[in-house]
């Protein structure tokens, strides 16, 4: 992609993930060109990439819509992520060295410093950034470029669902404290190199958002 189309791709992807464009909403080219101040060519290139990533669908070979969301897809993606991450934790514990341990500890500390505040996009962005960095630090010890690429793909597929969960938890003091407790327990198991416990904790940790997302999707 060109630099211009890459910008369009990033902006549109971010808007879809955050729900600024709703599932099944038609993406009118006139609206997109106005919103992003980009030409039709770069936007078509950006849309084609988002079709490949299953965030956008083609309508009658001439238009585009935001991809739909469903409970079945939610369960499938999150189950795949949880099992993939659990496997990567096992490999990371077996292969990671002292520098890996130090990085996990540092990222866990940075994440623990965040506390719930006002319902701002900045808070969500900062939490998500540190949360991703923490999880990435853990699995980085596996040392497999290809497995990490597969993990990143699953992460992207889960992004819209994750953002629903983020809005419902990060801005809640009680829920945020529970998440901090989970992260501390997980970090301790990883650094103790307790493979079985760390893997199961990671799997359960990544499955916990499901009920919250289901409630939100049901309008509760």
Swiss-Prot record:
GO CC annotation: cytoplasm
InterPro entries associated with the record: GntR_C, TF_FadR/GntR_C, Tscrpt_reg_HTH_GntR, WH-like_DNA-bd_sf, WH_DNA-bd_sf
NCBIfam families in the cross-refs: PRK11534.1 (NF008576)
DNA-binding region in chain numbering: 29-48
This protein's name: HTH-type transcriptional repressor GlaR
All copies of domain HTH gntR-type, residue ranges: 1-69
Regulation: The repressive effect at the glaH promoter site is specifically relieved upon glutarate binding.
Any GO MF annotation of the entry: DNA-binding transcription factor activity
UniProt keyword list: Cytoplasm, DNA-binding, Repressor, Transcription, Transcription regulation
Biological role stated in the UniProt entry: Negatively regulates the expression of the glaH-lhgD-gabDTP operon in a temporal manner during entry into stationary phase or during the first few hours of carbon starvation. Thereby is involved in the regulation of a L-lysine degradation pathway that proceeds via cadaverine, glutarate and L-2-hydroxyglutarate. Binds to two primary and two secondary sites in the promoter region of the glaH operon with the consensus sequences TTGTN5TTTT and ATGTN5TTTT of the primary sites, each separated by six nucleotides.
Keyword Chaperone applies: no
Taxonomy, superkingdom: Bacteria
Gene, per the UniProt record: glaR
Pfam families, per database record: FCD, GntR
């Amino acid at each position: 992609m060109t630099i211009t189309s890459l910008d369009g791709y990033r902006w549109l992807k971010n808007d879809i993930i955050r729900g600024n464009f709703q599932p099944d909403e038609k993406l009118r080219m006139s609206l997109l060109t106005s919103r992003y101040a980009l030409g039709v060519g770069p936007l078509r290139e950006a849309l084609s990439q988002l079709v490949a990533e299953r965030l956008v669908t083609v309508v009658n070979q001439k238009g585009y819509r935001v991809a739909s969301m469903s409970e079945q897809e939610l369960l499938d993606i999150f189950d795949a992520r949880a099992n993939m991450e659990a496997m990567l934790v096992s490999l990371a514990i077996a292969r990671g060295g002292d520098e890996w341990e130090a990085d996990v500890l540092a990222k866990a500390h940075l994440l623990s410093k965040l506390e719930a505040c006002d319902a701002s996009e900045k808070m969500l962005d900062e939490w998500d950034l540190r949360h991703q960095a923490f999880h990435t630090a853990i699995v980085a010890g596996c040392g497999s470029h290809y497995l990490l690429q597969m993990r990143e793909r699953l992460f992207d597929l889960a992004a819209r669902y994750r953002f629903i969960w983020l809005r419902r938890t990060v801005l809640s003091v009680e829920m945020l404290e529970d998440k901090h407790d989970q992260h501390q327990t997980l970090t301790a198991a990883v650094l103790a190199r307790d493979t079985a416990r760390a893997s199961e904790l990671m799997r359960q940790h990544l499955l916990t958002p499901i009920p919250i997302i289901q409630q939100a999707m049901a309008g509760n």
